[in-house]
Amino acid sequence: MTQVGQYIISNNSTSNLILHITKKLVSGESLFNLKQEEILIIQNVCTLMFSHGIQILLLRETLHNIGVSDLVVLNRKVPDEFWFKIFCMIKQRSGSEILKHIFSEENAAQLSKKLHHTGIVKQIIESFFLDEFGLSITIPAEIIHDGNIMFSIGAIYNHRLLKLCRYFNKFWGQEVYEPFIRKICKHLWFGYLIFFDKIKISHGAFSQQKPEHRNGLFTFIQNDFKVFCGIVEKEAKVTECNLSDLFSIGPLQF
């Protein structure tokens, strides 16, 4: 165990490269100045954290929807645009014949079983996350085989985490958006360090970082690491973009 902050201890298994990248991220170093291997590690970690976050959100919604058959209740958080996108994907993968039965109450249950059994539901869900958010994600079978899975996905469609994921993948590698992408990377990186036991946070951090503190625990921990290591953060670069782009971008185009 190595002390890397007043409230942070690094595990012995944590590599020097991980700590080296951490120092670069908190120093405000541009992502364009990092080595290729460092960039690849950061991108993979961010993708991993987005995937885990989405799976947790889907698990939450799946648990909420267990045993629920009331369509009004199931559809309470699902936007209409989500259903239109799913409709288009079903049409594209299954042909027009299936659309004759898709709105029939009598055939709905049988049709749902058929789509699950043939693997079309799995294909649609994986393609949906790739097309909309640029994320290749594997959802556990226990969740994907749930009868209300599409309602669960629709419920998180406009969640902030998915908006961040779309923003991250759409603007990754574009210099004008680099400061915001780096900020996302920094928070996801520290989430990775904590959740995957690369660093341990002492109980004192939670008493010092009070709920009313605006910046939150991750920023508190980042500042602790920065001060302990004697890192002076570089001045933020002024860019022409702003975070309002996060709420206006549509599906990704590759």
Curated annotation (Swiss-Prot):
The UniProt entry, under Pfam families, shows: Herpes_UL79 (PF03049)
Source organism's superkingdom?
Viruses
InterPro entries xref list: Herpes_UL79
Protein family: Belongs to the herpesviridae UL79 family.
What protein is this chain from? Protein U52
